Amino acid sequence: VVFTHSHSDHLNTTEICFRLREMASVIQKKDKEVMEIYGNDAVRDCIMEIIAKDPHVDLTRMRFHRIQKFEPFRIGHLKFTPLKAYHKLDEEALIFVIEDGRSTLLYANDTGALPEETLDFIEQQNIKFDVVSMDTCRGILDGDTHMGIRENVELRERLRRMHAVTPDTEYYLNHYSHMCGMIPQEYERLVDQEGFLLTYDGLSVTV
């Protein structure tokens, strides 16, 4: 499991505890599987804090991997490169470049406008994205530690100027919310005018 940051809508420590005790024995046989967790220091601290209160957790079922911005790591055939996000400013929140040797995805969920050091890294590494998935939580409102449609357009144009995308690159918007007062169908019509695709539960994308 790869975590971007420690906000509770992304990191459910209670469910991790369930996975590390006999409650999960049906799907996870003792001494057979280890839960591999990747995250920053804040993610580790949150997990360890809740684990310390649960006497039934078996720590041998978990292996934590500390990840940091701009330091790639691999899980199976996938290469992950963490990038700095603009989100939860009291920790190093992350987004990811994910590559499988054929295609490259920018996973920019839960972030405001990308920091310059992140954009500089993308440009310096000459990364080209086949798919860009962007946070759009703010909708038609001004962005903050989340992006809205304006920031989505600006990021796409910046990536184009950097030659980090191609005419065939697909752009998906995720993490949208009700804060801008629009239902999904209304917002979908708006983003469609900008050439974006709005995600939904169960969406599968083939690259």
Question: Predicted segments — roles?
Answer:
Residues 33-44, 133, 172-174:
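Short internal beta-strands
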Residues 1-37, 127-132:
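Active-site metal-binding motif and surrounding structural segment of the metallo-beta-lactamase
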Residues 114-203:
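Cap/insert and terminal regions of metallo-dependent hydrolase folds
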Residues 61-64, 79-81, 191-198:
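Active-site regions of enzymes building and remodeling cell-envelope glycoconjugates
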Residues 12-25, 49, 180-189:
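Metal-dependent catalytic neighborhoods of phosphoester/phosphodiester hydrolases
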Residues 20-31, 53-59, 123-127, 157-168:
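Alpha-helix termini
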Residues 5, 37, 80, 96, ...:
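Divalent metal-coordination and catalytic microenvironments
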Residues 66-121, 203-207:
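Core dinuclear metal-dependent hydrolase active-site scaffold
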